[in-house]
Swiss-Prot record:
Binding site for L-isoleucyl-5'-AMP: E543
Listed name of the protein: Isoleucine--tRNA ligase
Cofactor note: Binds 1 zinc ion per subunit.
Location of this chain's protein in the cell: Cytoplasm
Gene that this polypeptide is encoded by: ileS
EC number: 6.1.1.5
Binding site for ATP: K587
Organism: Acholeplasma laidlawii (strain PG-8A)
Length: 896
């Protein structure tokens, strides 16, 4: 007789195969249809707010794995805070100005030269908005909840108006000024760059040692030894710097005299082949001040000056000084009233001031200058070196120092307040505070102007003598016009139309044509919180570790300048995403992992589970092989949820629920284990330690549930009468644990937990996201757990012996086994406390157990004697005429 239909087999609509690529978008549509984001906000609206302010990604091309990694981390934080009862509005944002968009528009065939600035800007705007639409859909596909219908864009009229008002206040406080200084300049982008836009990469350069002929009688027939890796800056040389307190030597080699730093002489002797060097005199650097030398390429006399920036680490101790091409050179030159010579144009070509090198690209001039020095006898040594050199972070091409008129924000004015504000920020990692502190300490004034078109205009007027009108009232008026008409009017309207009606200042004005640094754009994004009535400062900024020099830095600067407070209360940062071998991803290496492909093939929840399984504070790795491992972990979760949902078929918690105290010992143990787990998981979430969350939950699901509790309880769940007390106690335990696990995992796998929650027949809300995060608790009965641990150790020994018996073909499956157990008094007492002495066969999934006390553990496995029950497959002493055991006979009677 077939008893299959009499068994209570699991039934659920939660499918074994996730098919997440198809199912997740359907789940997301459901979230939108019930307005889930606003529903949770409404539920928590009277509670304490938690604001994570979104750093704006750049609106260009599809999202990459770094975007997915970061946005998912933010979603973890927000979902946890939401389910903990906090009010968590989240406004996504986009950075929409800048050179990459200009380049993409130009690449598409748009001829910039045939268009007005306003026409070109309109095309850039259209492109940026399309990119926002693309990325918005991709971020939503990740399962990120937020106010996607009302994001902030740095091109929005209101955003720009608020940004200009920040600029206006900084002007009013004297923080903004225009100056001629050497700044990072990218010939490939034809624009000034801030320090945050520079990335250091290896570069091959010419390293040369040059002799400058001294003038005067004090050191006759003498060459000053200088070293440089930028020969193209020699046309701009206006001085040689020495350290006032260092010891220098005048020495002779083969009849020629030289001056160099005493400490570096041994290195120079070796490098330059000065095998007969003889020191003639020692003296302090200050001795050389105001002495003169002749330029090696031009008919020009220049002075020796003193500079504290001179070091004894490399070179010669005498520094070629070109105030137009270096920060240190600029400041030391200012002390000595040196000119600011910078004979290089915006494209990197030498100007007429460079004489014979005019028109050459600076790198070509490099080679020519070296040859000219060789020919005129001033080149003492040259070689090619590889060194770390600043590059344009967009074009990846070298940048140069070049002096041009630019707008600056004075960091010196703010530095004390910035450093003080950093102390008041909560740092998720202590090194984050150190890193930003050091960056602020070493930071020079911020060049905020860019010689581009697509960005926020710098709304400054000039009088007929080219003096800027630094008038807050004027700038605020322009801001109000931008808010209504947009910033293109700066290029479309004439000056008179841009001025206030009551303006009484000078006429015949012209407009500044430079735009603001995009870091000034994003660095004022906290204005969106004020504009939308949200708490300021934000509770958290969470971004990549590169933002210590970028967004964390620029946001702090503008907020301190205007509000006097940090825009963030806490900083959390993450590392970079590398391939499985720890290499940077690139198309050329073929190691790029596309998040869109992962989501379509494996699912957003699998990608999110990967994010939760790595230590985000450091650089992390991802590869197809690693994703397969994560998929396997996901499959275990899904199978476990499916089984638990299936065995809850027919269970109504309002009718069938058995309270904790009445459930029996092992059910209470499992519930207690879950409560302790929930406590630890909450603690980990509160510390944003997501990898610890997965490290805690996965072993519980795989070992405690799947491999033990859900395995041994199958007999009762399938074969006992539906209303059997023990069966209902097990179902009550499973119900508690399942509902708890789904809530604990919702921040990480929201699609899967939503789907599983929907499959629960009895629940309180439309979506699990409306549930509260379970808080867990301490062990209700510590002694219960202590005794369980003793049993668990015994069980592990038994499992090993069963496996050996299986390998020896004594048994096939564990139900074929009979166990003879000899245990010590402690183990026996533990089994008695757990009420397991007569239940070990069920718990160990064998057919019979004989237990005795002994001094030490002994386990014997033999084949069980008896009859196989045709319904439950246990081997029992007796079966009835229908081949079923006493228990199954009773259940079948009840079904009649």
């Amino acid at each position: 007789m077939n008893y299959k239909d009499t068994l209570l087999m699991p039934k659920t609509d939660f499918e074994m195969r996730g098919n997440l690529g198809k199912r997740e978008p359907e789940i997301q549509k459901h979230w939108e249809s019930i307005d889930l984001y606003n529903k949770v906000l409404e539920k928590n609206k009277d509670n304490t707010p938690f604001v994570l302010h979104d750093g704006p990604p750049y609106a260009n091309n599809n999202i990459h794995i770094g975007h997915a990694f970061q946005k998912t981390l933010k979603d973890f934080v927000l979902r946890y805070q939401t389910m903990s009862g906090r009010y968590t509005p989240y406004i996504p944002g986009w950075d929409t100005h800048g050179l990459p968009i200009e380049n993409e528009v130009t690449k598409s065939g748009v001829d910039r030269k045939q268009l007005t600035r306003a026409e070109f800007r309109k095309i850039c705007r259209e492109y940026a908005i399309k990119q926002v639409e693309v990325q918005r859909a991709q971020f939503k596909r990740l399962g990120i909840l937020g106010d996607w219908d009302n994001p902030y864009l740095t091109l929005d009229k209101s955003y720009i108006a608020d940004q200009v008002r920040v600029f206006s206040q900084m002007v009013d406080k004297g923080i903004i000024y225009k100056g001629l200084k050497p700044i990072y300049w990218s010939p490939s982008s034809e624009s000034a760059f801030a320090e945050a836009e520079i990335e250091y990469m290896d570069k091959q350069s010419k390293s040369i040692y040059v002799g400058f002929d001294m003038m005067g009688d004090k050191f006759p027939n003498t060459k000053l030894l200088i070293w440089t890796t930028t020969p193209w800056t020699l046309p701009a040389n206006l001085a040689v710097s020495v350290h006032p307190n260092f010891d220098y030597v005048w020495f002779n080699n083969d009849g020629k005299n030289y001056i160099a730093l005493k400490e570096l002489l041994p290195k120079l002797v070796e490098k330059l082949g000065f095998s007969h060097a003889k020191v003639l005199k020692e003296f302090k650097g200050s001795t050389l001040e105001f002495m003169n030398y002749k330029h090696p390429l031009y008919d020009r006399v220049s002075p020796i000056i003193l500079g504290e920036h001179v070091t004894a680490e490399d070179g010669t101790g005498l520094v070629h000084t070109a105030p137009g091409h270096g920060e240190d050179d600029y400041f030391v030159g200012k002390k000595y009233n040196l000119d600011l010579l910078s004979p290089v144009d915006e494209k990197g070509h030498m100007t007429e001031e460079a004489g014979p090198y005019a028109g050459m690209f600076y790198e070509k001039a490099n080679a020519q200058i070296v040859e000219d020095l060789r020919e005129n006898g001033h080149l003492l040594y040259d070689e090619t070196i590889t060194h770390s050199y600043p590059h344009d972070w967009r074009t990846k091409k070298p940048v140069i120092f070049r002096s041009t008129p630019q707008w600056f924000a004075s960091i010196d004015m703010l530095k004390g307040d910035l450093l003080e504000a950093i102390k008041g920020v909560k740092w998720h990692t202590s090194w984050g505070e150190v890193r930003l502190t050091n960056m602020i300490k070493d930071r020079n004034d911020w060049v905020i102007s860019r010689q581009r078109v697509w960005g926020v205009p710098i709304p400054i007027f000039y009088d007929n003598e080219n003096n800027p009108l630094l008038d807050r009232k004027l700038i605020d008026h322009v801001a109000s016009l931008f808010e209504v008409h947009g910033s293109d009017i700066w290029y479309e309207w004439d000056v008179e139309k841009l001025l206030p009606s009551d303006y009484e200042g000078p006429r015949d004005l012209t407009k500044e044509l430079d735009i603001m640094d995009v870091w000034f754009d994003s660095g004022t994004s906290y204005n969106i919180l004020k504009r939308r009535g949200l708490p300021f400062p934000a509770d958290m900024y969470l971004e990549g570790s590169d933002q210590y020099r970028g967004w964390f830095n620029s946001s702090l600067t503008t907020a301190i300048a205007v509000d006097g407070v940090s825009p963030y209360k806490e900083i959390v940062s993450h590392g970079f995403v590398l391939d499985g071998k720890g290499r940077k991803m690139s198309k050329s290496l073929g190691n790029v992992i596309d998040p869109l492909t992962v989501m379509n093939d494996q699912g957003a929840d699998v990608l999110r589970l990967w994010v939760a399984s790595v230590d985000y504070e450091a650089d992390v790795r991802i590869s197809n092989d690693l994703m397969k491992q994560v998929s396997e972990s996901y499959r275990k979760f899904r199978n476990t949820f499916r089984f638990m949902l299936g065995v809850l078929d027919g269970f109504n918690p309002e009718v069938n629920y058995i309270g904790w105290s009445m459930r029996g010992q092992l059910n209470r143990v499992m519930t207690d284990k879950y409560y302790v787990l929930a406590t630890k998981v909450n603690e980990s979430y509160a510390k944003y330690n997501f990898v610890e969350v997965t490290r805690l939950i996965i072993p519980f699901v795989v070992n405690d549930l799947s491999a033990f509790y859900l395995d041994y309880t199958k007999d009762s769940l399938y074969c006992d009468a539906e209303d059997d007390f023990e069966r209902r106690a097990i179902q009550s335990t499973i119900y508690d644990i399942l509902l708890g696990l789904l809530r604990l995992l919702t921040p990480i796998m929201p699609h899967t937990t939503s789907e599983a929650y929907d499959s629960l027949k009895y629940k309180e809300y439309d979506n699990i996201y409306l549930e509260k995060m379970p808080i867990g608790g301490k062990l209700k009965e510590p002694k219960l757990q202590e005794n369980y641990d003793i049993f668990d150790e015994l069980r592990n020994h038994v499992l090993k012996h069963l496996e050996l018996a299986r390998e020896a073909k004594v048994i096939g499956k564990s139900l074929d086994a009979h166990l003879d157990l000899s245990v010590d008094q402690t183990t026996y007492d533990a089994l008695e406390y757990l009420d397991l002495l007569n239940k070990l066969d069920k718990i160990l999934i064998v057919s019979s157990v004989h237990i005795t006390k002994a001094d030490q553990l002994d386990i014997k496995v033999s084949k069980a004697d008896g009859h196989v029950c045709a319904r439950c497959w246990n081997i029992v002493k007796e079966v009835n005429q229908n081949d079923v055991c006493v228990r199954c006979e009773s259940v079948l009677e009840g079904l009649k």
